[in-house]
C-alpha cells in the first residue's frame, strides 16, 4: 500500500472524478458563506433556475460588514445594508441556516464554524474568503474560493480542482515566555517568505504543534495563506477530539466513536513523500511584529528595522524601501520607540477566548495612553458571553478599551471600524497591506 500524506488522504477520499490531466471534481463537505462574496453567486443560480444542492451542508453568517457598535444592518452604510438584506433573502429562499446579527451566536465565519463543531477532521471545506485555511487546524482540507466557485459549489456540492504540491513545516524547540502562536506563524512567514507556499498545501507538525491548543493551531493555519499556500493542515489528535466533544454539530453517541476511528487514520504515513520539508527551531524566538506592508516584513520586538540598502535582491530592496516610506519609518530604528494611535484586538486570527484572556492578563490594573483609541472585538457571540462571564470585558474597559459586538471589524476597511489617513495601529489581524484597515492607514 502506497504511503500518503494527510493532504493526499483527504483529497483522494473526496475525488468524484479525475481526468488524465490530473484535474479532479472534488466533493465538498461544508460550504460557508458570508454577505460579501455570495450575492452574485445566488443571482446566477436564480438566472439559471438552479437550486442549492445541499442546503444542510451550507451555513451563512454576517461578519465582514456588520457594525460592532450597534446591532443593526443599517449601521455600516447603504452598500453593507444591501448586502446583508440580500443574504437574509438568499438564505430564506434557498433554505440555508443563517447566523444573522440577531442570532446570539453570530460572529466571524472562521470562528463560529469551529466553535459549533461544523468543522471536523477529514472534511473538505470552502468559503469565499482567503482565511478559510483556518479550518485546516482540525485536519480538514479548507481553502478560499472565488464567487464563481461559490456558485458552482452551491449548485453541485463539488468543485473543480488540481492537485497541489505538499510541504511539511516542522516546528521544534520549547516555546519561550511571552511567545504566542501568532509570533510563531509570523516567524515562519518571515523566514520562508510570503510566496514560499505558492503551489503548496502546507502541513504543520512537530513537538511545538503537538503541544499547543486548538485555538493556537487555528491562528497558525489561518495565516498559511500569507505564505501563498493553498491551505494549511495539522493532523487531528487528542487535543482536537477533546475540543470537538459535545459541540452542537459534532457527532454523538455511536457516530462519535465511529468518527474517532476514522479521524485517527488522518495523519501522514511515516514514509509519505513531501515535495519540500523544512524544520524551524523556535527555542530562542522573541515576540514578532511587522514593520512593512506584507507579513514577511517582520522582526523580533527587540530588533531594528532592517536597512533596505543592505538587501541584495533588487525586488525586495524596492519593496522594503516602499514599505518604509508608506509606514513612515526609517531603517535601523526600533519599533518600540514608535508611537501608535490605535489598537485592534480581533479578527479570525486572534478573537477567540484564549486570545482575549491573554490580552486581558497584560492589561489588568493598567491604563492605555490617553491618546490611543483601542477596541476589542470578540470573534462571536459565544466568545463575547464567555469573556463577560469571566469579567474580561471589565478589564478591557477599565484599561481604556472599547468592548464591541462581534464582527470582522478593523481587520479590513469594509465597515465603519477603520483607520484615518496616517494613523498607526497595533493589530492582531492577519494582513498589514497598504490601506487594509483604511486608506492611508499603517498596520503593525
Swiss-Prot record:
Q: Return the cofactor note field.
A: Binds 1 [4Fe-4S] cluster per subunit.
Effect of mutating residue 47 to N: In strain: MNb027
Q: What is its EC number?
A: 4.2.1.33
Q: Give cofactor(s), names only.
A: [4Fe-4S] cluster
> Mind listing the GO molecular function terms for this protein?
3-isopropylmalate dehydratase activity; 4 iron, 4 sulfur cluster binding; metal ion binding
Which InterPro entries does the entry mention?
A: 3-IsopropMal_deHydase_lsu (IPR004430), Acnase/IPM_dHydase_lsu_aba_1/3 (IPR015931), Acoase/IPM_deHydtase_lsu_aba (IPR001030), Aconitase_4Fe-4S_BS (IPR018136), Aconitase_4Fe-4S_dom (IPR036008), IPM_dehydratase_rel_enz (IPR050067), IPMI_cat (IPR033941)
Q: Which SUPFAM superfamilies match?
A: Aconitase iron-sulfur domain (SSF53732)
Query: Which stretches are annotated as coiled coil?
Result: none
Which top-level enzyme class is recorded in the Swiss-Prot or TrEMBL entry?
Answer: lyase
Among its keywords, does the record have NADP?
no
Alphabetically list the UniProt keywords.
4Fe-4S, Amino-acid biosynthesis, Branched-chain amino acid biosynthesis, Iron, Iron-sulfur, Leucine biosynthesis, Lyase, Metal-binding, Plasmid
The record lists the catalysed reaction(s) as: (2R,3S)-3-isopropylmalate = (2S)-2-isopropylmalate
Highest taxon, organism lineage: Bacteria
Residues at which [4Fe-4S] cluster binds: 348, 408, 411
> Which pathway features in its UniProt record?
Amino-acid biosynthesis; L-leucine biosynthesis; L-leucine from 3-methyl-2-oxobutanoate: step 2/4
Q: How does it assemble?
A: Heterodimer of LeuC and LeuD.
Physiological role = Catalyzes the isomerization between 2-isopropylmalate and 3-isopropylmalate, via the formation of 2-isopropylmaleate.
What family is reported?
Belongs to the aconitase/IPM isomerase family. LeuC type 1 subfamily.
**HAMAP family given for it?**
LeuC_type1 (MF_01026)
Q: What is this protein called?
A: 3-isopropylmalate dehydratase large subunit
Source species = Buchnera aphidicola subsp. Uroleucon ambrosiae
Q: Which gene encodes it?
A: leuC
